[in-house]
Amino acid sequence: MEETYIDTLDPEKLLQCPYDKNHQIRACRFPYHLIKCRKNHPDVANKLATCPFNARHQVPRAEISHHISSCDDKSCIEQDVVNQTRSLGQETMAESTWRCPPCDEDWDKDLWEQTSTPFVWGTANYCGNNSPASNIVMEHKSNLASGMRVPKSLPYVLPWKNNGNAQ
């Protein structure tokens, strides 16, 4: 039994192609060869069915039900299904012990207790006092000296902006 199992895993083992009996293919290349040969022999491909447990098994359509009941790879799949259903039955979700940490902040309360109005750019700032500085409207400041402005175009001409002239 052990030799048979090792023999099926040997990547250098030669396998016979189900589409062309003259083809002997190494096991490691067999899946690729099956795809190629299936395309080259559509008449034979229509007569064969693929095993649902191992795509390397190409069986005549009349014998597929017998093959499914006796396929060696079926036991691996069935064992996986059994193990999966057992593990699902044993797994129970542990109830979370996480608790929200205590919080001293109340942002809603802070908003209502706030005495000053929020800062808005370009509007008068009324902070409760009537000083002349508090009634000044904020203006946009520039780092340029007065009388200077930012250039409206780049100092060079980009190749794709050549005023529509083709080169």
Curated annotation (Swiss-Prot):
UniProt keyword annotations, A-Z:
Cytoplasm, Differentiation, Metal-binding, Repeat, Spermatogenesis, Zinc, Zinc-finger
Q: Where does Zn(2+) 2 bind?
A: C51, H57, H67, C71
Determine if Metal-binding is one of this entry's keywords: yes
Keyword flag Zinc: yes
Where is the protein found, in the record's own terms?
Cytoplasm
Q: Which GO terms describe its molecular function?
A: tRNA binding; zinc ion binding
Source organism superkingdom: Eukaryota
Q: Give the CHHC U11-48K-type zinc finger regions.
A: 14-41, 48-75
Can you name a GO cellular component term?
A: piP-body
The GO annotation for biological process reads: cell differentiation; piRNA-mediated gene silencing by mRNA destabilization; secondary piRNA processing; spermatogenesis
Q: Name one Pfam family in it.
A: zf-U11-48K
Known function:
Required for spermatogenesis and is involved in the suppression of retrotransposon transcription in male germ cells.
Q: Which family does it belong to?
A: Belongs to the UPF0224 (FAM112) family.
Name-wise, this protein is: Gametocyte-specific factor 1
